[in-house]
Amino acid sequence: MTDKLTSLRQLTTVVADTGDIAAMKQYQPQDATTNPSLILNAAQIPEYRKLIDDAIAWARAQSGDRAQQIVDASDKLAVNIGLEILKLIPGRISTEVDARLSYDTEASVAKAKRLIKLYNDAGISNDRILIKLASTWQGIRAAERLEKEGINCNLTLLFSFAQARACAEAGVFLISPFVGRILDWHKANGGKSEFAPAEDPGVISVTEIYNYYKQHGYETVVMGASFRNVGEILELAGCDRLTISPPLLKELSESTGNVERKLADQGEIKARPARMSEAEFYWQHNQDPMAVEKLADGIRKFAVDQGKLESMIGALL
């Protein structure tokens, strides 16, 4: 009998949510996603030391200013790890823009273009890269501009339907709605500590977004992310893509049985609503206290880990 990871792959594109090259070799995903926290974790792996050394040497050659060297080395390290991962996957790597730029459209566009140039200089074409941006209004506007210039984007830290709708209307390539962090919030702020997979608030959110996109003919890819258990993953079988951590990939690969399709495009197309204004976006997003909290919290956490990464690099300069 087949294992559940193999069965899931018949329904959904499986993406690895890690910067660990060993995990890529083991699970052979189509694509891979990284973020500042995963880059920080990957930087602790001894085999990656040469990638750090290369990034530092490159940064020293770019500027004599120490602060600029730290920023340059951080960018180059993220790309170096991405380059190693791209050797092992047929698809795309997602590399994230500094979370501290999440409310600055111009700076986000500039950082995205810098990351793309580093990949291009290493011989990697744009069709193998996704630029990750937080799903703030400013991040979505940055993505809209980048998409028009042939730079595909992955909009992350997505918790509200308003964020999902704004991303679709901006024509972004892919969104990453966070399943597990939605569940975390409801466990911490509600009277319920356990949810069946079909009743999981994160699963319900992604299902709603997926159905809305398909019903309105949006081409933006829906990639469920941030899973807490295999039940959430199986309940979203059929979603365009799912990005899964190595421990959960392992659990799926060690479980036998066929995975049942839960999400499907029914082929029904409805008229799209008028495009959201900035005021409508903020008002609708603000109606969801979970989304407001988790977006801000996610940006803060990624910014903290970016700072830790820069401190580590600074100590080596």
UniProtKB/Swiss-Prot annotation:
GO terms for biological process: carbohydrate metabolic process; pentose-phosphate shunt. It is an enzyme of class 2 (transferase). It catalyses: D-sedoheptulose 7-phosphate + D-glyceraldehyde 3-phosphate = D-erythrose 4-phosphate + beta-D-fructose 6-phosphate. PROSITE patterns: TRANSALDOLASE_1, TRANSALDOLASE_2. The active site is at residue 132. GO terms for cellular component: cytosol. Keywords: Cytoplasm, Pentose shunt, Schiff base, Transferase. Pathway: Carbohydrate degradation; pentose phosphate pathway; D-glyceraldehyde 3-phosphate and beta-D-fructose 6-phosphate from D-ribose 5-phosphate and D-xylulose 5-phosphate (non-oxidative stage): step 2/3. InterPro entries: Aldolase_TIM (IPR013785), TAL/FSA (IPR001585), Transaldolase_1 (IPR004730), Transaldolase_AS (IPR018225). Its EC number is 2.2.1.2. One of its GO terms (molecular function) is transaldolase activity. It holds the Pfam family TAL_FSA. It is found in: Cytoplasm. Homodimer. HAMAP family: Transaldolase_1 (MF_00492). Belongs to the transaldolase family. Type 1 subfamily. Transaldolase is important for the balance of metabolites in the pentose-phosphate pathway. This is Transaldolase.
